[in-house]
Amino acid sequence: CHEGAHILLMFLLGAPPALVKLTALGCRMVPNREKILSYGQMALVSFAGPGTNLLCAGGMFLLGLEAHPFFGANLVLGMLHSLPIEPMDGGMAFHALLRARMKGERADKLCFAVSLGLILPMAGLGFVILLRTRYNFTLLVMSLYLMLYLVLKRDLFSG
């Protein structure tokens, strides 16, 4: 429902994606060139996915289903994707909102700094978790992937 929310909102805004490309770590949507979304609309589209996850988790909580695995999955996915780290949805929304308020290069630099400022502690925490558990490397690997993406500005697993 996460990716579907992005696509549905793009259709509702009259700008369906020209191409939806599945990658190893999610989905990349190539924008439609016939209708360009405003920065505010881009931010809304970016938040549609994590917002849907958080709404699903909230609904499950209200129904007393917080022990169900989908509750935790939706909650974590929604919270993680809301972080203002590019290329996460929150980072894309943050970047769009910055570009609406300041010149492109300044917005790009600020978004990069905020993303890096959040990724570095995540990587440190991931390393601590790996040392303590001796097997859980998930946060460390995700942080390293995000750092490489941020520096290279491309999806490393997009095939």
Q: Could you say what each language-model-derived stretch is?
A:
Residues 1-159:
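Hydrophobic transmembrane alpha-helices and their immediate loop junctions
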